[in-house]
Curated annotation (Swiss-Prot):
Binding-site residues for Mo-molybdopterin, renumbered to this chain: C137
Keywords: Disulfide bond, FAD, Flavoprotein, Heme, Iron, Metal-binding, Molybdenum, NADP, Nitrate assimilation, Oxidoreductase
Single GO MF descriptor: heme binding
Name under which the protein is recorded: Nitrate reductase [NADPH]
Positions of FAD binding: 655-658, 672-677, 687-689, 737, 740
Natural source organism: Pichia angusta (Yeast)
Catalytically driven reaction(s): nitrite + NADP(+) + H2O = nitrate + NADPH + H(+)
Domain FAD-binding FR-type: 602-713
Annotated GO biological process: nitrate assimilation; nitric oxide biosynthetic process; sulfur compound metabolic process
Job of this protein: Nitrate reductase is a key enzyme involved in the first step of nitrate assimilation in plants, fungi and bacteria.
Superkingdom of source: Eukaryota
Length: 859
């Protein structure tokens, strides 16, 4: 460090200073968290301690979170590590403390001298700096865009930003040592995590790495402590002024290149596509994603209101109230002004801005946490600022809202209008807080709440307002507005025949179809439909329609059907039900009574989670107590049941499952479920499986059934579509969690000493760890080797165990031919439950071999 002034303004290390509050610049040193939360103990992150105050945005795993907005603001310039927002694409890599200094990074690609270096050597060989940097997720404020039109990403509120003191070396120094080629333009960065679509890799421009104004770091400490696992322990990249998605965590590799990264995450994440590109267009054409012009690097200008808080109530008086919040910008450009409007943007008031980063700049050179603080060497602004404005409460009482906007030193100003895009990223239209007068008090509404309903956007949307109109969808006589339309029910728009909307169906006529097996009429949202034309084609079988004949099926229908399914209903629409609001509905969930059998195909009943057994990183056995200890489930072998829960918005979500437990088990119901956690392709993950995953012991879930067209009786006797069969053999084709219905039949066969039905099972999975119930299946095969055979198949050929003796690859015609060779049609039946690709192979094989459909059951 001879080239840098070493006579620092503050000659003592920060740990030796008794009272850091006396320093003229912000400093904090956080004590590491130690307690792992119960939710995380059940995931691959079972070693990561986290703050329970963080708002989880994607369920329990992977962990994505932001702090409560007020708590973030009240923490001040430097955010506690425990409250720093988190964006993880998968499980956190486990790095023991004793291995931190041996962590190794490779530098390769278009360089003269590629090399590898350990963290201990980085600390010894390179100049070390401590720098305050604000990090921001590109999806910050995404939920506001999703309220207008659902995009591809999960919901973020306005608190997806945090600031820390990062300690490490400059990325440019590490790259410079390898002597990059003059033709090189980019640096690829790769982490050690392994999310759903492979290792996370992205890139930045090489010239930025070499620019001291950019101050791009490789950091190993945050606020004076080793990196927390969620934030990249033991080593990460920190890129100020750029979206957080470029600051790769758990850094393992740096590759110098002449082109941008070609990694999946670089292509399909962190892009702002043109606003006219719909989710369907983006999904069907990769060219949108691979256009580097749409890649996000620098942050855009953003200002947020934190005070008043959402739903805060203030009594009107003669006092003043201080409106306050924060702002940030990208590319190192300072925010030059922040303005507040109390009259819908007609006039603006200039807020006072505080730039805490400048206090480091003014202090000169000094050392913190073993690193030189040299903010004074640069002009760039890499941190957020804080603003405030005092206004009379009487003026707030005359206002309908508070608006905020910023302008940077380039005179770029925040837009009034939202720029909607598929990823809902970089949303920075004016932040608006609505003011609701309630007598002599004022209540304030922020746009949204990150992980639950709430805010003025929810209210406006429910009232039928247009969030994007000239008054944000609010009713205001002083502002010219388009005629306010009643709220349009999107479900009915898809489901109804406009010509039948005025046809009235008498309730007596509707009720006459109760229990009808030929003309099943059912009601959804007050409209009547005739399901008879779809009995044979319904994917869930005719029984799914017949069980709601003559009843209001609103909750169940909306909970389980996609938009595609809803668009099939106009041809079945008969009209609206007479005085549906005045009809007394039978209560759908009855009080627990001492009933011998739990299930009822027409009524929901509640069961209670008693235990959750973690089988693997994404598979669990949920064990539910029935209504009393002697009660049977009442589920025939081969059929399934419905489970339903309410999501965070209060809407029912319903899915069909087949229990793992035998139907002879009393007082308990065990269901094996594979949890589909959120990922890039499906940012919300499996909605129902994540709701079930978040259940706590003692929570209740609703159950109804049985449903399904197949039932196994005993000794080869079964029924399918109400027709009896006598089978000698079953060929079972299962994939992943689709093993559960076939396992039900297996249990019935091999628990009966008189049952000699033979079974051949093909069980396909991606990796060895994905194979469910393997111990149970192997036990049956060992005990009945002549009667039962199972072929395990793995499709991920790049990660096959060396000693793998099972099938390699996916299901083929040859495999199916082998299974039925020597068997006569009519003596065997196929039982199939797998993903669409696997089911498609079976269907094509059946067509090619002219196998009658009556012998093929798709669960």
């Amino acid at each position: 460090m001879d080239s840098i002034v070493t006579e620092v303004t503050y000659g003592l290390e920060i740990k030796k200073i008794k009272d850091i509050t006396e320093l003229p610049f912000p400093v904090r040193q956080d004590s590491p968290l130690t307690e792992v939360l119960p939710t995380d103990l059940k995931t691959k992150d079972n070693f990561v301690a986290r703050d329970p105050d963080l708002l989880r945005l994607t369920g329990s795993h992977p962990f994505n979170s932001e702090p409560p907005l007020t708590k973030l603001y009240d923490s001040g310039f430097l955010t506690p590590v425990s409250l720093h927002f988190v964006r993880n694409h998968g499980p956190v890599p486990y790095v023991p403390d004793e291995n931190i200094l041996d962590w190794e990074v490779s530098i390769e690609g278009m360089v003269e001298t590629p090399y590898k270096i350990k963290l201990s050597d980085i600390m010894e060989q390179f100049d070390i700096y401590s720098t305050p940097v604000t990090m921001v997720c590109a999806g910050n404020r995404r939920k506001e865009q999703n309220m207008v039109k659902k995009g591809a990403g999960f919901n973020w509120g306005a608190a997806g930003t945090s600031t820390s003191l990062w300690t490490g070396c400059m990325l440019g120094d590490v790259i410079g040592k390898a002597r990059p080629s003059k033709r090189a333009r980019f640096v690829w960065m790769e982490g050690a995590d392994n999310p759903a679509n492979g290792a996370y890799r992205t890139c930045i421009r090489l010239s930025w790495c070499m620019d001291p104004e950019r101050c791009i770091m490789i950091a190993y400490q945050q606020n004076g402590e080793w990196l927390h696992p969620d934030h990249g322990k033991p080593l990460r990249v920190v890129i100020p002024g750029v979206i957080g998605g470029r600051s790769v965590k758990w850094l393992k590799k740096l590759v110098v290149s002449d082109r941008p990264s070609e990694n999946w995450y670089h292509y399909f994440d962190n892009r702002v596509l043109p606003t006219m590109v719909t989710p369907e267009m983006a999904k069907s054409d990769d060219r949108w994603w691979k256009d580097e012009r749409y890649a996000i690097y620098d942050l855009n200008l953003q200002t947020i209101i934190c005070k008043p808080e959402n739903q805060q109530v203030i009594k009107i008086s003669e006092d003043e109230y201080e409106i306050a919040g924060f702002g940030y910008n990208g590319g190192g450009v300072r925010i030059g002004r922040i303005e507040v409007s109390l009259d819908k943007g007609k006039s603006w008031k200039l807020a006072d801005i505080d730039y805490p980063e400048d206090r480091y700049r003014e202090a000169g050179y000094f050392r913190l946490f073993g690193g030189l603080v040299n903010v004074c060497d640069r002009m760039s602004c890499l941190c957020w600022c804080f603003w405030k404005l005092k206004v009379p409460l009487s003026e707030l009482a005359r206002s309908k809202d508070i608006l905020i906007r910023g302008m940077d030193e380039r005179m770029m100003v925040q837009p009034r209008t939202m720029y909607w895009n598929v990823t809902s990223m970089l949303n920075n239209w004016w932040y608006r807080v609505a003011i609701i007068r309630e007598g002599e008090s004022l209540r304030f509404e922020h746009p949204v709440v990150a992980n639950k309903p709430g805010g003025w956007m929810d209210r406006v949307k429910a009232e039928g307002g247009d969030i994007l109109d000239n008054n944000w969808g609010e009713v205001d006589d002083t502002v010219k507005q388009a005629e306010r339309r009643p709220h349009i029910d999107e479900d009915l728009e898809m489901m109804c025949n406009r010509e039948k909307m005025d046809v009235v169906i008498k309730y007596s006529e509707f009720e006459a179809h109760k229990d009808s097996e030929t003309e099943p009429w059912f009601a959804v949202k007050g409209q009547v439909f005739d399901g008879s034309s779809y009995l044979e084609d319904h994917p869930g079988g005719a029984q799914s329609i017949l069980m709601v004949s003559g009843e209001d099926a609103t909750d169940d229908f909306i909970a389980i059907h996609s938009s595609f399914a809803k668009k099939l209903l106009p041809s079945m629409h008969l009209g609206r039900l007479e005085e549906v609001s005045s009809v007394t509905k039978v209560k759908s969930v009855e009080q627990n009574v001492k009933r011998e059998v739990l299930l009822d195909p027409r009524k929901w009943h509640k069961i209670t989670l008693a235990e959750k057994e973690v089988i693997s990183s994404d598979s669990r056995i949920f064990k539910f107590d029935l209504e009393h200890s002697e009660q049977l489930s009442g589920l025939p072998t081969g059929k399934h049941l419905f489970l339903r829960l309410k999501d965070s918005s209060g809407k029912y979500v319903m899915r069909a499952y087949t229990p793992k437990s035998s139907n002879s088990l009393r007082g308990r119901l065990e269901i094996l479920i594979k949890v589909y956690f959120p990922n890039r392709e499906y940012p919300n993950g499996g909605i129902m499986t994540n709701l079930i995953e978040n259940l706590q012991v003692g929570n209740q879930i609703e159950v109804k059934g049985p449903v399904g067209e197949f039932e196994y009786v005993k000794c080869g006797h079964c029924s399918f579509n109400n027709k009896p069969y006598q089978m000698k053999h079953f060929v079972m084709i299962s994939g992943g969690s689709g093993i559960t219905p076939t396992y039900q039949v297996l249990q019935a066969i091999f628990s009966d000493p008189e049952d000699r039905t033979s079974v051949q099972l093909f069980f396909g999975n991606k990796k060895v760890d994905d194979i469910l119930l393997r111990e149970e299946l192997d036990h049956i095969q060992e005990k009945y080797p002549e009667q039962f055979k199972v072929d395990y198949s793995l499709s991920d050929l790049d990660h096959l165990p060396e000693n793998w003796s099972g099938v390699r690859g996916r299901l083929t015609f040859d495999i199916l031919d082998t299974y039925v060779r020597g068997k006569k049609m009519g003596e065997y039946m196929l039982l199939v439950c797998g993903p669409p690709g696997m089911n498609g192979v079976v269907e094509n094989w059946c067509n090619a071999r002219k196998l009658d459909k009556q012998y093929v059951v798709y669960f």
